[in-house]
Amino acid sequence: MREELLGKEVLAMYDIRGIQSYIFKTNAVKEIIGASKLVDDIIINGLKSYVKNRVSTEERDLYLVDWHNEATADAFIKNDSKVLMQVMFVGGGNAYVLFRNGSICSAVNKYLGKYVLEKTYSLNVAIAVIEKTDSYKEDYRKINIEMRRIKAHMPISKPVGAFSFTATDTVTGMPITGVADKEYHCTESLLKRASVDEKNVEKIQCH
């Protein structure tokens, strides 16, 4: 983040990269469902995790993560508002979040990047940040331009590959790290399977 933004109100946009290939990397129904669920929830869960683990109990009410709550829709922009972070929208692997200053945003960005990698093993999050103005329309236009610029120059990080003596997953090519359903899987596959509801798998397979 640019240093001049650290003390200013900012709008951040988060974009999960590689969603399609992540979800449909395998034909296993359980992994496809699990991957879809992980992608749908990853940003909001990451922000909730930050508030829970990095924000003091006294300040948690100043971090608004529930963007569906109409009662707090304009909480950040009200006069004399003390809200430090407010999620404005989440969907389709994207999220728009307002921060009272860039320093808070920077801390969240570092946490979220690590969280996404730990929970999905191979997805990346692109982050664009601009100074907030009084024009939401103009801010939306600028943040999307900035995101396109960021993504055009952002290398896609991948986990360390397998050594020649390490067994690998036949689908992903990643190192085998555990067993599920009596089969060997890499970390990415295990995380997908761990997030799925068995009842949903049964419903799909019955159709």
Predicted features and spans:
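Regulatory and interdomain segments flanking nucleotide-handling catalytic cores
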Residues: M1-H207
